[in-house]
Curated annotation (Swiss-Prot):
Disulfide pairings: none
Subunit structure, as described in the record: Part of the 50S ribosomal subunit.
One Gene Ontology term, aspect cellular component: cytosolic large ribosomal subunit
InterPro entries documented for this protein: Ribosomal_uL13 (IPR005822), Ribosomal_uL13_bac-type (IPR005823), Ribosomal_uL13_CS (IPR023563), Ribosomal_uL13_sf (IPR036899)
Keyword check for Ligase: no
Highest taxon, organism lineage: Bacteria
Protein name: Large ribosomal subunit protein uL13
Family: Belongs to the universal ribosomal protein uL13 family.
Function noted in UniProt: This protein is one of the early assembly proteins of the 50S ribosomal subunit, although it is not seen to bind rRNA by itself. It is important during the early stages of 50S assembly.
Gene Ontology molecular functions: mRNA binding; structural constituent of ribosome
The entry's keywords: Ribonucleoprotein, Ribosomal protein
Biological-process GO terms, alphabetical: negative regulation of translation; translation
Length: 142
């Protein structure tokens, strides 16, 4: 008997909505990354994108433990000398709360074209409203 290999034509992708209110950042990000990769499915194939679409709402209400709210620093660099920028978790949560979950999940996905395709299936919203009602997403409890 041959080993089953999923192909892009045979993969079925579902839509799930995750409420991040009061959830810990790392715990929710790992579950989202697993779902985006498709590792929860029996037909998982490492070189094929078998994951589902994930909609995250209430990203502004995600929490971190300990003193990380004030001490966690996100860095970015422009590429020019002296072009490093830094922003704390608290400031980033006030300015762009979607970016916190996006950065956490993106670091858990593969690097390369397949990882970028998986990341495009993640939709993050700061509030309760999202514009994917037509896809009839199922609620995913994490």
């Amino acid at each position: 008997m041959k080993t089953f290999t999923a192909t892009p034509e045979t993969v079925t992708r579902d839509w799930f909505v995750v409420d991040a209110e009061g959830k810990t950042l790392g715990r929710i990000a790992t579950e989202i990354a697993i779902r985006l990769r498709g590792k929860h499915k029996p037909e998982y194939t490492p070189h094929v994108d078998t994951g589902d679409y994930i909609i995250v709402i209430n990203a502004e209400k995600v929490t971190v433990t300990g003193n990380k709210a004030a001490g966690k620093i996100y860095y970015s660099h422009s590429g020019f000398p002296g072009g490093i920028k830094q922003i704390s978790f608290e400031k980033l949560q006030a300015q762009k709360p979607e970016m916190i979950i996006e950065k956490a999940v993106k670091g858990m996905l593969p690097k390369g074209p397949l990882g970028r395709a998986m990341f495009r299936k993640l939709k993050v919203y700061a509030g309760v409203e999202h514009n994917h009602a037509a896809q009839q997403p199922q609620v995913l409890d994490i």
